[in-house]
Curated annotation (Swiss-Prot):
Secreted is among the record's keywords: yes
Pfam families: T3SS_TC
Coiled coil: 127-171, 250-299
Subcellular locations according to the entry: Secreted
Family: Belongs to the invasin protein D family.
Gene name of the encoded protein: bipD
Domain remark text: The N-terminal domain is an intra-molecular chaperone that prevents premature oligomerization of the residues on the coiled-coil region that are involved in interactions with the needle and/or itself. The residues in the C-terminal domain probably form oligomeric structures at the tip of the needle that are responsible for the regulation of secretion of other effectors.
Gene3D superfamilies the UniProt entry points to: IpaD-like
Protein name: Translocator protein BipD
């Protein structure tokens, strides 16, 4: 099938499998000077950086543990290195900025040059594919902004929970060789602070709310105006499982509580990990989109120049 037609159909409906296939074959097409992975990295768009930083944040969160009594011996919990989460947010923000800059470069340098060639030098009508490229680029910018905002917000939330889990070490201790003391009231207050200050995110104007609700699932809720709010249910379960200050539990009861409490922490981790996987998929889609866009613009520019030479 004509590559022109393939590109037009894939770009118009944002058919990601088709775009991926085109991105793989386009560099071999003599008429399409598509960007390569090396070109993307040279432009500062290297998806490996934010994804590695987010992976490090997930690993750091997973390594957190509460104090426990094992074989009659009290074992301290493990605190988090919170700077790992800051690093992840900075990487996500920087990657989004590089992605947006690249799209704007395509829009101003490549797409603008194509329009000038087609329109100013003879008044021919641009290819129908060209007419939709600006809209495709605009939608790409919107998706970048939305994902960066949401991933940054979820990472901040992740960090807040990690901070609480670290501070729990200060309120759980061994009463004696058979019992554990837990100041649950103080821990409740810490969790409530997280609930009261959950980050909210705003989707870009004109975002497809239904699509984003389906994309993000029940880890968040999205209002009709595009405000994204983190679902606090898991934190509420953690908070409500806690006893009053000064409570003493035997080892068996404490370990049962610890298992349930840590299970909710793991559920939060799963929510964030799922979003990070979707973010990774979105980055892959972006790379393929840019490769196809650059190839399409290159092809259309050559077509317009050939027309003018007739």
């Amino acid at each position: 099938m004509n590559m022109h037609v393939d590109m037009g159909r894939a770009l118009t409906v944002r058919d990601w499998p088709a775009l991926e296939a085109l991105a793989k074959t386009m560099p071999a097409d003599a008429g399409a000077r598509a960007m390569t992975d090396d070109d993307l990295r040279a432009a500062g768009v290297d998806r490996r950086v934010p994804e590695q930083k987010l992976g490090a944040a997930i690993d750091e969160f997973a390594s957190l543990r509460l104090p426990d009594r094992i074989d009659g011996r009290f074992v301290d919990g493990r605190r988090a290195n919170l700077t790992v989460f800051d690093d992840a947010r900075v990487a996500v923000r920087g990657h989004a900025r590089a992605q947006r800059n690249l799209l704007e470069r395509l829009e101003t340098e490549l797409l603008g040059g194509t329009l000038d060639t087609a329109g100013d030098e003879g008044g021919i009508q641009p290819d129908p594919i060209l007419q939709g490229l600006v809209d495709v680029i605009g939608q790409g910018k919107s998706d970048i902004d939305a994902y960066a905002t949401i991933v940054e917000g979820l990472t901040k939330y992740f960090q807040s929970v990690a901070d609480v889990m670290s501070k729990l070490q200060d309120y759980i201790s061994a009463k004696d060789d058979k019992n554990m003391k837990i100041d649950g009231g103080k821990i409740k207050a810490l969790i409530q602070q997280v609930i009261d200050h959950l980050p909210t995110m705003q989707l870009p104007k004109g975002a497809d709310i239904a699509r984003w609700r389906k994309e993000l699932g029940d880890a968040v809720s999205i209002s009709d105006s595009g405000v994204v709010t983190i679902n606090p249910d898991k934190l509420i379960k953690m908070r409500d499982s806690l006893p009053p200050d000064g409570t003493v539990w035997d080892t068996a009861r404490y370990q049962a509580w610890n298992t349930a409490f840590s299970g909710q922490k793991d559920n939060i981790q799963n929510d964030v990990q799922t979003l990070v996987e979707k973010y990774s998929h979105q980055n892959s889609n972006f790379d393929n989109l840019v490769k196809v866009l650059s190839g399409a613009i290159s092809t259309l520019t050559d077509t317009a120049k050939s027309y003018l030479q007739i």
